[in-house]
């Protein structure tokens, strides 16, 4: 039985949390995006309140742009994905370069969408990349202990978001 350092364990745990947070948030925002366009332009305020995110957005359009892409906003989808990537860089020898590449591809998809102005439409590609990441973790993370730490972070984040109905 190998020992895992506290730092490595934290990075594995938070990698799982950040990736799951982005995945779950994007899935939820797909439905919210339709509501914002079709019926209630202030529906994002409930989302912010549920996640305890400061409502610093001018309107629904500003929310969809800033909450998706603002790298200076610590609550944004992009910031969470960037933190997952930062943890992944530190763990590249553990999780494999291939697994890390899926997070990089998700970041690239977000950057391309921001440059093209396609906004929330990038969520499908990002979700696909994150699902590929989870499959890659199952395939290439050889240590059961390390895999369990990543999945513990994932499932705790899923539980946390489910409890607030996200």
Model-derived regions: residue spans:
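Alpha-helical transmembrane segments and their helix-helix packing motifs
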Residues: 1-163
